[in-house]
């Protein structure tokens, strides 16, 4: 019972405690109701003793009334004050402090007194300042001085919350302070010390505000009933105080925060009255608020601008802190500007309320007076201000300001805190112009006058930033634009931005982030565009921001008034208004052209800020055209309210045009992700030379010139819009937009001229360039319209229509912004793109950057519309305009192509999308599968470098209509930007032949070298791309370079050369292969005449390339020029891609056989020259794939396109080997006439015998030389990697290959050599590509490629005629030094092109830098060395030399050639296998590359039978080391090859056994080669690579069976007795070599 009683007592205590708690909570609730000010003041008072002291007299009474009810309540309050900082001030006021509280208060008395002392002088100053404020309201100077003083006193405190609040609170509480007791002060200090970090921080203080705001609203309603007038005035003061409080919160001032909290409670109590009224009557409330705000704003705007130096730091600090609070402007204006706009009214009320709280009765009375004054003033002010704003800064605005000042004077006087008033005004200004002030105030530090100009600039900048936050997608571009144009548009931009800065303006700011340029631009567009289009966006944004409803926009005056009244509401309604603006802008996006240009211009404007002055000059000239609006904007910008009114007025006047612009900009910005926009803009900026950049740059400055010119040309609303849209983003890239402007056929020359000018000028002055460019751009009105339509989804459709309606002369609308691109990607573009298919085939000048970031979107776009792709580039033009930066330039260039080619060039537009490796791949596949475009519409992206990347995608899209060969190279693209693009377009436009898949120009070079219209898209010389080939990004450049040869011989068949280039080359080797496999099959569907040669994207490139090859299978063997770099990075992927192309080539006659080159670039170029010549003869542009230098001399079209591929065997070795194994198993290829290349010659020697026997040897590319010995050397390494078994399997392969016609001997030499420079001599490299050539090409791909490709190869084997040689090149990644050699060796493959026979031997000399282990890896990923026995093998010498150099350069590289199966029906593979084995041991024996090289030469010189033996014998004499089998290969290796079984038997001693094994094959093959030297028998490096086996078990089994059957088969066929003896000797030699080692 006792326990129970105890527990009961405890329970009673607890219940009592709970009861107390509830009681106190109820009390507290009642207290706020009865005394909301006190409740509010509690937290704030605790945080700031000064503010608490100011309110303490009344608070004490109120607290005594509410708190005496219970001592416990007082105690709890005191405890709460310790934590909440609220009760302690009340205790100080009510003198009801708990024992600990007084101690603390006493302990803090000194601090509070000190702070008070410190604040006394500011207080005195504030009093003086109050007097000055009265004078200041009469004169701005006085106000400026006063605000400077107050801000000087408060700016630093504002920057630091306590300091700023202490002076203010001390100033405001000086009167209060005298009435306060020290405990209250100590409490304030205590609160400030304890709650500074807490309350000063936004969380708690904000929470207090929020918590108090909701209950205070109810309380306010009650209080409003009791004291409506006071509540109204208090609401205003509350708003001001809230703004100040926000600043304080950002400043982390606990004391003032507490006072503000109290003030907020009182103010909030009153605010709800206004808020509910505002909510009930949003327009009325907004108008009232706006009117009041206009009054305060106007006075504050000037004053703030003048003392912006002080407010600078404050605004920045406020931005940082308040911005965090504010969610809307999170990106850049997350700072004070973010928070203030939403809480502007509350802040103003709070700020005003703080003075009212400080001087309770007096302030309330003053507030009432202020309210009375404000209410009449704002109403006339709003109307008058609107009018004055329209007409410019007028005395009426001055009157309004004076009214505001008068209304604020008593308010400020009684508050005695000039800082608060200043802060209030500042916050008001910041709320309206906070973006500008955030940046503007920072910039205004220099001088008060500059403060006006700079704040204006910064208003635009900040509004842009604010808009950024509002539209993060477009935020990034917008800031740049507003920065650049803001400086120029300091006066104009602030105008527009000040009214909109609250929220709506940021959108408009972004739309017209360069307010000046926007205003000018809009005025110009107003002249040219319908007035509704020109300035509507500005007005509409405001209407949307201010009223947040379309109804507000209906009445211009009402809108102005509402905006003035809504300025307060804009803060609360800002998000909604922004949404409304977004919606409206979306509605107006249909006219997005003008908007998109603005949008684009804005991103660029920031970067072009340095160029801002020039832009401002242009804008000033534009202002001259729209001087009334510009001057009004400038003048009104000085006055926030006036500027706002002016903006509204100008909007009402220019609303038709500008409204759509800004809205379109807003919508586009919304669509454009800030990240995307930023990256997109960065791309633009990176490619300033590109036309889209130029256009974008042109847009803002062009507004004046464009007004003049555009009005002259026909006042093209759209061109103006386009210029407007583009210029801000394109300021840096003004050169780009100019280029982009070129695409219009009629204006193409002008655009080209613009590009040339803008490219040169963009860097210097985008403004002047833009002006000149816009003059030109204004001439093609259709394009602007297209841009307008393209800018948004609806606009995109309009754009599409415009293009369709307009002749191809205006096809390219580079005006299309990145946002448009994005929208295109969204799918809006796709619909419009489809509508105008033939009219505008402007090859999108895809910019490298645009390719990367915009490519995803663009690809989607390109995928969707086939014919509309023309418009896509236009839609993308802005992105392409700066060829590298965006597809806008592509659009322009593409536009030109479209104009000339009409429909033919529409597809290149898609290429920018395909530029993205992954997405582009999918896009390419989709486009290919669609195949809507006719082959005649060869998508040859002549327009620009960017356009070239796009052309690939476009080609993929173009598919049948235009097997566009987008040779896109980032580096090359800049070349196309200026004059070259026009010529390219003109040529491609006219030249595009239905068959001739436009070889996507890798840049303007193609255009410059433009050949007959059918070759319009022919890529220029790839030389620049060769340089680009260093990077995977530059693979397209290589492709373009290779394309250039097709340009020289304009053959319709050569149109599409998928340039497997940088993008494909390095970045997505692995993915590329897989994609290429699937796409290759899809391409097969397409007719060969539509060979689509996807450009550089590694993934899509391979896939598209394969597809293009398939398309071209019959008519064109697409020779995807693969750069050495591409070889390196895309080695596997490239190979696969090439394999796919080979497959498509397989469909094509052997003349179309592809030849991947792996030799040094110079050799590749030399060979490529032959190949190109052959390719041109054969009429297959794919041969242009050969090196850039080779491009100069296109080969006959018959020649299979050689794939210049270099790869690092180390990375790709395993994959290559598996690919080779698959290829060998999949594709037996017949040998064609031995290729001229050294490797081809050796392959011919080796394959000549195997070709008659239809034996596919798996030659191991040996660094030893390009001739057969290297293959034997390769064999040993392959033996190390189960090459013994592979060689056993190889006979089977040979047999299988025998089944294939000898025409298609695919000689894929693998270098199983260990990490030695011997590898560079992949004599097995000469492989002939036939139907299985595709498989071989795939073999070129990485292991994954080999895995996926072999299946396709197999299928392609059956599909492709044996006559078509597929030349695969070892894509294995070679050492960087090896790569050039590979390029040299690769040309060997071109020899096939001589006879245009499928067995175009590719001497893919790849020297994988691999050690013995590397050799194993190489064996796994052994790079394929396709070698064809074409009569064209004359190139072998060059390659052999280059190959030797390559070998030397890569001493450690071990090349593991992927096994290529050339099915020489004549020769059994057994001898070849033996030969390889012999060579491989030699390679193993010969660590020195030099010995291998001579051996390879000797082997090449001699038929594989005898000479190779000699070489191997010599090698054996020199180097018994199996790692040096090259020397041993000639004789000893042959002997060891005779001991093929031994080699097979011993994997550990595979080097020795390899030599024997290889020699067996060599010896067996040598007689055959002697008999049929020119019949290149494909040396299939045994697919015994473990990786290959694992990757392709079927291939391994197949190879194993073949190897088992081939040795007997080959000897049975053509193996002479001496060959068998030689095999035995080779085996013995390999063993001897091992022993010697």
From Swiss-Prot:
InterPro entries named among the record's database cross-references: CRACD-like, DUF4592
Tissue expression notes: Predominantly expressed in testis (at protein level).
UniProtKB keywords: Cytoplasmic vesicle
Record-annotated disulphide pairs: none
UniProt superkingdom: Eukaryota
UniProt feature coiled coil, ranges: none
Biased composition (Polar residues): 170-190, 341-353, 745-759, 879-896, 935-956, 964-975, 1017-1030
Compartmental location: Cytoplasmic vesicle, Secretory vesicle, Acrosome
Signal peptide: none
Biased composition range(s): Basic and acidic residues: 229-249, 355-374
Name this protein carries in UniProt: Acrosomal protein KIAA1210
Organism phylogeny: Eukaryota, Metazoa, Chordata, Craniata, Vertebrata
